[in-house]
Amino acid sequence: MKQITARELKEKLESNAEVLLIDIREGWERELFNIGGLHIPMGELPEHLSEIPKDRDVVLYCEKGIRSTKAIQRLEGAGFQNLVNLSGGMKAWKSLAE
């Protein structure tokens, strides 16, 4: 499974790289803090497969990188190969500002 660090992702976003973000956390978590992208809670992924492109990089993120790892494993089982996990999730992202 491909991984990306918070710093690497921040640099990609700042350089306007073609990347899609998917936040798989629950709505209440997203309301507290997010870095944008689509919001598809992990439990709803099966109903939203058609919204996930297969022709560009897609970075999945959650709070710590654990749920997004599991989500990527499930999506890879459904044929997706372009998925990247935000290592450490939002916790790692927030630590960039500290």
Model features per residue range: what roles?
Residues 1-20, 24-59, 64-98:
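Rhodanese-like catalytic fold shared by cysteine-dependent sulfurtransferases
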